[in-house]
């Protein structure tokens, strides 16, 4: 990495990031394989080892030196041995190396930004649970929420043009354009199908990089529009990357509403009093303290943005405007809403006593039980009504292996949904998994659940379905009396970096 950084430092004197020569360096592919940026297809094949995979990479680089294969039309693949033989193998190798290379300048700029802001432990900021304390502190004072589903797919050429703002190496962009048009199916990656190509699964690192750059383009424009229509400038987001002709390009979008007669007559309608934005994957939430007029304004903003800048027909029905007091929104596997928590206060002045009815807004996070039951039914743990069933595909495993699998699923679920306001849904999911485990073990031993539990140890299923309260007791025995109240409340963990499979409604067990 020091050699790569030194190479880029020399090129920075010319204000260019020339990455194309790195494609022909063998150590780049060794870094991509060793650091686990993506799984090398050669390592998944038992017929190859690391030495032979690097040997094939060297042969591929030699062929890339000898001939300019990337200028050959795809129809000439019958005449070109490079495109005819091992097409998927070479595309996998090139995509891994290219994904590693294009991330280098972004990683260096991110590191420098963290150093400037004196952020030492950036890993704790990666937890997706860290967003919920922010929602608890801020969303209880807001009125409306804009539920947005980021549109897709994006044309390949738009992706290349997006990268052109940060990568000024024309050769690398031409290679990427050819690679995407020749090998990749961008639509199948965004919308995976059962009969879709497995190419995107083997090249997820490159596709994730392209998708993140696409979303970053959208969010950078959104931040610009927000700063143009807000009383206070955004302080939570930092500009990490330099843009070219950005303000001139977005001027037309800003003028869509600023130059409207009604808005110019009343400048207060242009300024946004308070607004917050959060996103995870394709789901984004925009919450505001203002009236519904502000939310309709931003809805028109976003529709115009996607249609003009990204050349996409963005359907307005993808954006939902809801009032937080009457509706809940789904985000990161939770149903979140703001409800009024009534309370009665007794006040006494001298000899007169009276009661005061007070209502406090409270941010609630609930576990959506129906989608979770559907996910469990899809994974064959229960039926569509929530009745537990056995897992036949696991019946051939050992008892300890079966229990360990159910225990891991149950504890991961409890760990992820520890922030639920009520624990009733958690207990229902635990009951389904517990009885499904018992039915699976009884099926294996050709017995009924009742007979199997009587013959086996009574603590067989109690150990791995230990509640979160029991885990806290085993970990902090001296302070358990204090932690008992913590368990009954919402607990957010900072070691969760991805959404739970059950919460994502795409169960994979």
UniProtKB/Swiss-Prot annotation:
GO CC annotation: chloroplast
Keywords on record: Chloroplast, mRNA processing, Plastid, RNA-binding, tRNA processing
GO molecular function: RNA binding
Single biological process term from Gene Ontology: mRNA processing
Subcellular localization, as worded in the UniProt entry: Plastid, Chloroplast
Function: Usually encoded in the trnK tRNA gene intron. Probably assists in splicing its own and other chloroplast group II introns.
Family statement drawn from the similarity comment of this UniProt entry: Belongs to the intron maturase 2 family. MatK subfamily.
HAMAP family documented for this protein: MatK
Protein name as annotated: Maturase K
């Amino acid at each position: 990495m020091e050699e790569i950084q030194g190479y880029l430092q020399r090129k920075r004197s010319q204000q260019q990031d020339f990455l194309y020569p790195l494609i022909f360096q063998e150590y780049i592919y060794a870094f991509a394989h060793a650091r686990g940026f993506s799984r090398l297809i050669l390592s998944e094949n038992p017929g190859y080892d690391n030495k032979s995979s690097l040997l094939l990479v060297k042969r591929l680089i030699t062929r890339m030196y000898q001939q300019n294969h990337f200028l050959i039309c795809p129809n000439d693949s019958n005449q070109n041995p490079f495109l005819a033989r091992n097409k998927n193998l070479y595309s996998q190798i090139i995509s891994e190396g290219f994904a590693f290379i294009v991330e280098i300048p972004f990683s260096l700029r991110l590191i420098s930004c963290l150093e400037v802001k004196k952020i030492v432990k950036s890993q704790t900021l990666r937890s997706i649970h860290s967003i919920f304390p922010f929602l608890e502190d801020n969303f209880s004072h807001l009125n409306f929420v804009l539920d947005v589903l980021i549109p897709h797919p994006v044309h390949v050429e738009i992706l290349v043009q997006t990268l052109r703002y940060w990568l000024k190496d024309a050769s690398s962009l031409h290679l990427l354009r050819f690679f995407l048009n020749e090998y990749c199916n961008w639509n199948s990656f965004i919308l995976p199908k059962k009969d879709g190509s497995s190419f995107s699964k083997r090249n997820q690192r490159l596709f994730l990089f392209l998708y993140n750059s696409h979303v970053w383009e959208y969010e950078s424009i959104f931040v610009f529009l927000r700063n143009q229509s807000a009383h206070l400038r955004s302080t939570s987001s930092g500009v990490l990357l330099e843009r070219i002709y950005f303000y001139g390009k977005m001027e037309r979008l800003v003028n869509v509403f600023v130059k409207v007669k009604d808005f110019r007559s009343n400048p207060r309608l242009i300024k946004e009093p308070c607004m917050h934005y959060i996103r995870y994957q394709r789901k984004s939430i925009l919450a505001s303290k203002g009236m519904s007029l502000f939310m309709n304004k931003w809805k028109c903003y976003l529709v115009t943005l996607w249609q003009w800048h990204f050349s996409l027909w963005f359907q307005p029905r993808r954006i939902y405007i809801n009032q937080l007091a009457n509706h809940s929104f789904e985000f990161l596997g939770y149903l979140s809403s703001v409800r009024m928590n009534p309370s009665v206060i007794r006040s006494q002045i001298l000899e007169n006593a009276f009661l005061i009815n007070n209502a406090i807004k409270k941010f609630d996070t609930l576990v959506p039980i129906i989608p979770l039951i559907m996910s469990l039914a899809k994974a064959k743990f229960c039926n569509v009504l929530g009745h537990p069933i056995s897992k036949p595909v696991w019946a051939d495993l050992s008892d300890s292996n079966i229990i360990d699998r159910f225990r891991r699923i149950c504890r991961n679920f409890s760990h992820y949904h520890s922030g639920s306001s009520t624990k009733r849904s958690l207990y229902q999911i635990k009951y389904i998994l517990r009885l499904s485990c018992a039915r699976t073990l009884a099926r294996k031993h050709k017995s009924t659940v009742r007979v199997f539990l009587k013959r086996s140890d009574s603590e067989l299923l109690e150990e791995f379905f230990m509640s979160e309260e029991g885990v806290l007791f085993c970990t902090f025995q001296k302070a358990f009396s204090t932690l008992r109240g913590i368990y009954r409340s919402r607990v957010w963990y900072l070691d969760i970096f991805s959404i739970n499979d059950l919460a994502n409604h795409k169960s994979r067990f």
